[in-house]
Amino acid sequence: IHKIVMKPSFVTRLNRADAVVYLGLAVEHVFLPGLLEVASNPAMRPDPDTMNCLGPGCIACSPGVHVLDKPETLSRAQGEIHPQGNPHYNLNPENGRIIAQNIAAGLSRVDPANASGYQKNLKTYLAELEPKIAEWRKMAALLKGVKAVSYHKDVPYLGAFTGIEFVDTIELKPGISPTPTHLAELVRKMKEQKVALIVREQQFDAKTPAWLAEQTGAKVAVVGTIANSLPGTETFIKLSETNLRNLLKAVAP
């Protein structure tokens, strides 16, 4: 989501839009404030304090989410940390409820004439999502206690749902590429702690995770961080399902 390629059509769409739906917690800070500035839509403008959206047309999906990894102090020495906390809460399937509720509430506010329709659609969606969450909970039981490393520190919410214990990252620090010294220490740590799983988020190169797998015997699982990031992940439900199945496949005997 940090590396979305901007297109002129995005500005046109924002200029004409009644609302913009976004994850929030400044995860879109690389592109959303600039797009909102150029679009000059009075219903939505950039918030210089939070790097999010400000105005009646702004629909954030994050209100109500239990935010993880809120930093106590801010320093460039920590790498590219998120001041408002880890914004990748969409990787916990249970947060799908909150996301859907926030979208329905936002659309009802922006378009009150059709509020009943949005609430009806929310009820229908949750009726589909809730049984899937229960099913995924049972599937995820096989992942509880599995030790893993991820490429980037965007998986705490995934760990909270699955019970996977993430012990380190391939990156030296958030947004900072690994050094040979860090990788050597990571290999030692993985062997010592019997780390069985390497989680590669789809936006990162496969080379280093593959090398780590060769060195340690751990298996690599690829997960998507947003819809359409992997084949067959066009929706939140499909993304959650694909991620879970990829993890289970990697740790299967």
State where each predicted segment sits.
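Extracytoplasmic metal-acquisition and chelation regions
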Residues: 1-253
